[in-house]
Amino acid sequence: MDDNLFTPAKTINFNLIGQDGNAFVLLGGWRRQARREGWSNEDINKVVDKSTSGDYNNLLSTLSAHCNMDPEDY
């Protein structure tokens, strides 16, 4: 979780695997789940801004660093 923007690391229960791979769908799903889990708009925007500051690989890397993905879902 080296890419996590928070200390201590913050994650949400969201699995990127099995989602539509469209960047907007991933961001929207991640944002909705973060809101459900009580994240502040400031923290959500921090992750979204970092996610959209580069290419698609940066998006996936940043979002996955902020997700608690269950390995059994792979």
Positions of the model-derived regions?
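Long, contiguous binding/interaction regions
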Residues: 1-74
